Amino acid sequence: MDKGRCTILNSEELWAQARQLFAGGVNSPVRAAVKPFPFYVERGKGAYIYTVEGNKFIDYVLGYGPLILGHSPESVKRKIIEQLEKGWLFGTPSKLEIELAKKISSHIPSAQKIRFVNSGTEATMAAIRLARGYSKRSKILKFSGNYHGAHDYTLVEAGSAATEYNVTTSDGIPMEIMKTIEICEFNDLDCVDKKLRNEDIAAALLEPIMGNAGVILPEKGFLSGLRELTKSYNSLLIFDEVITGFRIDIGGAQSYYQIYPDITTLGKIIGGGFPIGAVAGKAEIIDNFTPAGRVFNAGTFNANPISMIAGIATIEELEKEYPYNIANKASKTLVEELERLLKIKHTINHIGSMFQVFFGIDKVRNYSDAKRANKEYYIKFHERLLKERVFIPPSQYETIFTSAAHEDDVVNDTIDKLAKVIGELS
């Protein structure tokens, strides 16, 4: 930290105040994983974030995924400012929600109709209710280590901060609810077949690429096999593309793998860094939402103009393709350099502009594997990188992201810092 600028003191003072005001000092648990206390960020631009003390970090967290264009891109900021001048909440429909829905539907193959909500959590919660209402079945099949937000129907064997803090199955969830959730390991079709065979599963819900236990990829045949099995047993297939939507491909993981679900949940990127979620899918299914059907969903801030315009502006940039070229190149280069530099046992799971490194293990294909990785070594890796002003997720069970702002100079600077840190840890 920069001496003379009270770096630790400033953040420490804020942390002391936060602990008096918030449970655990934070409003989302993974933020407390930075030790000995979080640094407080004042602003972000491009690939960088700046703390309240003025310290500059290269950012590979990117708000945990939404900021595929980097921080505060001018094209998005300009549109948001224009909308702020007009107003930001009306309690009525706006043409912006139609524009964003059209953009999403034009790129996400299965998105015939859409219901906007306010977060990924709300999206999966609504999608589960929708699947149950449509199918007239009560059970949901989910996969160990998949994280679908902080609500009762998915906080069973959950990844992300739920794993970091050892509350993969949260207190406060009635046993009656837990009995409606069936669990399989990711990449295990035999388990899926057994669970679906009773024909009481409303839907299989999963991240097509796991991003909340580190990055874990579907093995060849897993997604296609899952699609076939759900059809055979008359269960719906829900892809949670809150992370992968508009990141892996402009059409999401479903476009990349050419496997199309009945329902898709979206968030993060489609709001350009503002709160958003969406449930998309076949028209005959989405039309079960009120007021067209009897599956209730509502929200004061659903389709609010600011999130809509930020999403439109972001997707307009993504349609130019350059963001994917830059972000994917940055990720690929960093992974190649990590493979060259690391001499200890490890594996790196990588796709597009997202990756994660697992130490002490040579293969990670599911949640059980991810939990066997050397978490303590990862924490040391994270802490040493922080000293070099590089910010990667403080938890092993998150994803390292790159963006269109991670140009060659940023990546080269990062590689120099990686070499130093890995040398010190060797």
From Swiss-Prot:
Disulfide bonding pattern of the chain: none
Highest taxon, organism lineage: Archaea
Keywords: Cytoplasm, Isomerase, Porphyrin biosynthesis, Pyridoxal phosphate
Entry-linked Gene3D superfamilies: Aspartate Aminotransferase, domain 1, Type I PLP-dependent aspartate aminotransferase-like (Major domain)
Listed transmembrane segments: none
Pathway: Porphyrin-containing compound metabolism; protoporphyrin-IX biosynthesis; 5-aminolevulinate from L-glutamyl-tRNA(Glu): step 2/2
Catalytic activity: (S)-4-amino-5-oxopentanoate = 5-aminolevulinate
GO molecular function: glutamate-1-semialdehyde 2,1-aminomutase activity; pyridoxal phosphate binding; transaminase activity
Compartmental location: Cytoplasm
N6-(pyridoxal phosphate)lysine: residues carrying this PTM: K268
InterPro entries: 4pyrrol_synth_GluAld_NH2Trfase, Aminotrans_3, Aminotrans_3_PPA_site, PyrdxlP-dep_Trfase, PyrdxlP-dep_Trfase_major, PyrdxlP-dep_Trfase_small
Cofactor: pyridoxal 5'-phosphate
Protein name, entry field: Glutamate-1-semialdehyde 2,1-aminomutase
